Design a protein with these regions (language model features):
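Conserved helicase/translocase motor-coupling segment
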Residues: 1-57
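Conserved RecA-like P-loop NTPase helicase motor core
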Residues: 44-165
Length: 167
């Protein structure tokens, strides 16, 4: 799997450096599972631009316009087995869709008009050992958002949702 993570890292760097419309590091946002994050250290993704898949209820990333979603999301197999044993259908693709949309909406997609927001700059360690986010107030406006999704399944789920055709 080292070959896979190296290949994915190279593809991610290629997206951020060559394909993205905005190549500034400050505009990047990416995610993967936390235990895979270590494989991307030193990449062009930038450690400061990582945003956990579970992050909710924040506007601090409203200036991010170049996104990379490095997850192929599935339910925990134990949860699926629990519901399956009770003849309850669990919507697997809808779960994946919900996660990717919620994560994407941490970015500039949530910006409807020009506004000021507090954006994340860095982590600061307080004297008592607490980790505190250092923010800066900036003006943002709606911009085009690009997203790199290497998983064919996740791309298809997202495309099918946005380009749903009732025919």
């Amino acid at each position: 799997s080292n070959i896979i993570t190296n290949s994915l890292r190279k593809s991610l760097d290629n997206f951020f450096n060559n394909q993205a419309h905005d190549k500034r590091s400050s505009k990047r946002m990416w995610t993967t599972f936390k235990n895979f994050r270590k494989y991307f250290r030193g990449s062009r993704a930038g450690e400061r631009n990582f945003l956990s898949i579970g992050t909710r209820a924040t506007n601090m990333y409203g200036h991010k316009t170049v996104l990379a979603y490095l997850i192929n999301r599935f339910h925990n197999p134990d949860i699926l087995q629990f519901f399956s044993a009770r003849d309850i259908r669990v919507p697997v693709d809808e779960y994946a869709l919900s996660d990717i949309i919620q994560w994407m909406f941490r970015s500039n997609l949530r910006i409807e008009r020009e506004q000021e927001i507090d954006v994340f700059r860095e982590w600061k360690i307080e004297d008592n050992g607490d980790k505190v986010a250092v923010t800066e107030r900036i003006k943002v406006e709606p911009e085009t958002v690009e997203i790199y999704i290497p998983s064919y399944r996740m791309r298809k789920i997202l495309k099918d949702y946005f380009w749903f055709d009732e025919r």
